């Protein structure tokens, strides 16, 4: 019954922008919220000093949260007709 009320969500560049913004927000939030950073493997690229101790587990955790957040934001914006 709930699925019948959700609008058809097709991918558009604006949906992609919302997902990117939600992921950036989640990474920024996770940067300060994760208390035990740097316990797992690091990223294979050089990062600025701002992200010191931000490794693969932290990246996977924050982007997973960002995608969950984006799913809710996109659904809400689609339902409101703003997207």
Curated annotation (Swiss-Prot):
SUPFAM superfamilies: Photosystem I reaction center subunit X, PsaK (SSF81563). Keywords: Membrane, Photosynthesis, Photosystem I, Thylakoid, Transmembrane, Transmembrane helix. Residues 1-4 form a propeptide. It is a multi-pass membrane protein. GO terms for biological process: photosynthesis. One of its GO terms (cellular component) is plasma membrane-derived thylakoid membrane. Gene3D superfamilies: Photosystem I PsaK, reaction centre. It is found in: Cellular thylakoid membrane. The chain crosses the membrane at residues 12-30, 68-83. PROSITE patterns: PHOTOSYSTEM_I_PSAGK. It comes from the Bacteria. NCBIfam families: PS_I_psaK. Belongs to the PsaG/PsaK family. This is Photosystem I reaction center subunit PsaK. The gene is psaK.
